[in-house]
Swiss-Prot record:
One GO CC term, this protein: extracellular space
Gene Ontology biological-process entries: positive regulation of epithelial to mesenchymal transition; regulation of apoptotic process; regulation of systemic arterial blood pressure by renin-angiotensin; response to angiotensin; vasoconstriction
Family per similarity comment: Belongs to the serpin family.
Species in which this protein is naturally found: Pan troglodytes (Chimpanzee)
Keywords carried by this UniProt record: Disulfide bond, Glycoprotein, Secreted, Signal, Vasoactive, Vasoconstrictor
Functional note: Essential component of the renin-angiotensin system (RAS), a potent regulator of blood pressure, body fluid and electrolyte homeostasis.
Name of the protein in its database record: Angiotensinogen
Gene3D superfamilies referenced in this protein's UniProt entry, alphabetically: Alpha-1-antitrypsin, domain 1, Antithrombin, subunit I, domain 2
Pfam families cross-referenced by the UniProt entry: Serpin
Annotated S-S bridges: C42-C162
Subcellular location: Secreted
UniProt PTM: In response to low blood pressure, the enzyme renin/REN cleaves angiotensinogen to produce angiotensin-1. Angiotensin-1 is a substrate of ACE (angiotensin converting enzyme) that removes a dipeptide to yield the physiologically active peptide angiotensin-2. Angiotensin-1 and angiotensin-2 can be further processed to generate angiotensin-3, angiotensin-4. Angiotensin 1-9 is cleaved from angiotensin-1 by ACE2 and can be further processed by ACE to produce angiotensin 1-7, angiotensin 1-5 and angiotensin 1-4. The disulfide bond is labile. Angiotensinogen is present in the circulation in a near 40:60 ratio with the oxidized disulfide-bonded form, which preferentially interacts with receptor-bound renin.
PANTHER family in UniProt: ANGIOTENSINOGEN (PTHR11461:SF13), SERINE PROTEASE INHIBITOR, SERPIN (PTHR11461)
Length: 476
């Protein structure tokens, strides 16, 4: 019998192959039993609902109430424990949810460039955070709202039977497993190579009751869930209060505008993600270097530099190159640079799509000296706008059936994803075989003009981040 790890890898490869065979915008070739209710859980739900008393509720504390700061180290430790307890089925479920998140993320990324317009700065989007936010809302949804959310999450249903319904608890647990698999890899030497923290803020109008089972269910996705109440009648003031609260609690750069909200909004559902990746063997150059925003404009930016054997591929037909820089054994940073700066939009369309990971098979080892900007990026976006740009159903319109979240009238003002993304040097140890590289054969790769990037984890087949850098000093 093959070892469990080999069997798992083989099964994941099959999942990837099946996904690659799917055509069109919707991908249904998956073992959906991993994420839907089975007959046993349906029977348990039916028994639990028979004569069940009303779910207990509570009114969130005011936003000005004192709150302890988020302990990111403790968060990482919890994720490592989650990863350590995963069995084979858990890992398969995480891989499947990772792929579903990729498909949704690519679709939204491919369409919402119209919302951004021409990006002159830098921006970053998280497919897993988008999927997690929508799965969290699905946890609180009923009837047609739940149907629509299940459809956009990529899981079809044949009828109204329980066994066709997405199991929100399985999905949210799998999303936490996806995070844990990424973080745990860099902890073998007790030094965190990767940091990934997720915090959910549930902001309600004063007096609105939240159901306790809903908030408790969110803890399957992230242990830090912050329900708070505030007045939405002055939207600018409310946005400032939310920003101040989140920055005080997390210390991260955040962004809340409430642009899509109205004075009668009763809910802002916000997901905040902080990622920090340390590039092993890289160092920060002593002086800032030129980064060419276009043919005539440059800015001085901090640059990282490192040398090693990296996976690389140059596409001479479509004029772009890819360099894969490892964070850990299975997690990596993908750097995509057009050979000509004017081709950035074209290359983005070629690489950030559902079958884009196929070109990873073409990568091969190459001795490389890589120079690239040190990245500190912040991106915030309202999923209501992104889904509209992606021409998806009006899932997040203001009037939703969220009766598993609250029995009170819900009017959604904002569904925010806020990303704080950092890449920095880790000079503790050099990259592999640096001193053995034959200098004349070393390829110089310098990212001093617009480029694309992605953070990919093969262990969960998950693209955690997709980004575009036209100017490292400016957030789009």
């Amino acid at each position: 019998m093959a070892p469990a790890g080999v069997s798992l890898r083989a099964t994941i490869l099959c999942l990837v192959a099946w996904a690659g065979l799917a055509a069109g915008d919707r991908v249904y070739i998956h073992p959906f039993h991993l994420v839907i209710h089975n007959e046993s859980t349906c029977e348990q739900l039916a028994k639990a609902n028979a004569g069940k008393p009303k779910d207990p509720t509570f009114i969130p504390a005011p936003i000005q109430a004192k709150t302890s700061p988020v302990d990111e180290k403790a968060l990482q430790d919890q994720l490592v424990l989650v990863a350590a307890k995963l069995d084979t089925e858990d890992k398969l479920r995480a891989a499947m949810v990772g792929m579903l998140a990729n498909f949704l993320g690519f679709r939204i990324y491919g369409m919402h460039s119209e919302l951004w317009g021409v990006v002159h700065g830098a921006t970053v989007l998280s497919p897993t955070a988008i999927f997690g936010t929508l799965a969290s809302l699905y946890l609180g949804a009923l009837d047609h709202t739940a149907d629509r959310l299940q459809a956009i999450l990529g899981v079809p249903w044949k009828d109204k039977n329980c066994t066709s319904r997405l199991d929100a608890h399985k999905v949210l647990s799998a999303l936490q497993a996806v995070q844990g698999l990424l973080v745990a890899q860099g902890r073998a030497d007790s030094q965190a190579q990767l940091l990934l923290s997720t915090v959910v803020g549930v902001f309600t109008a004063p007096g609105l009751h939240l159901k306790q089972p809903f908030v408790q269910g969110l803890a399957l996705y992230t242990p830090v869930v912050l329900p708070r109440s505030l007045d939405f009648t002055e939207l600018d003031v409310a946005a400032e209060k939310i920003d101040r609260f989140m920055q005080a609690v997390t210390g991260w750069k955040t962004g809340c505008s409430l642009m899509g909200a109205s004075v009668d909004s009763t809910l802002a559902f916000n997901t905040y993600v902080h990622f920090q990746g340390k590039m092993k063997g890289f160092s920060l150059l002593a002086e800032p270097q030129e980064f060419w925003v276009d043919n005539s404009t440059s800015v001085s930016v901090p640059m990282l530099s490192g040398m090693g054997t990296f996976q690389h591929w140059s596409d001479v037909q479509d004029n772009f190159s890819v360099t894969q820089v490892p964070f850990t054994e299975s997690a990596c940073l993908l750097l995509i640079q057009p050979h000509y700066a004017s081709d950035l939009d074209k290359v983005e369309g070629l690489t950030f799509q559902q079958n884009s990971l196929n070109w990873m098979k073409k990568l091969s080892p190459r001795a490389i000296h890589l120079t690239m900007p040190q990245l500190v990026l912040q991106g915030s976006y309202d999923l209501q706008d992104l889904l509209a740009q992606a021409e998806l159903p009006a899932i997040l319109h203001t009037e939703l059936n969220l009766q598993k979240l609250s029995n009170d009238r819900i009017r959604v003002g904002e569904v925010l994803n806020s990303i704080f993304f950092e890449l920095e040097a880790d000079e503790r140890e050099p990259t592999e075989s640096t001193q053995q590289l034959n200098k004349p054969e070393v390829l110089e790769v310098t990212l001093n003009r617009p480029f694309l990037f992605a953070v990919y984890d093969q262990s969960a087949t998950a693209l955690h981040f997709l980004g575009r850098v036209a100017n490292p000093l400016s957030t789009a």
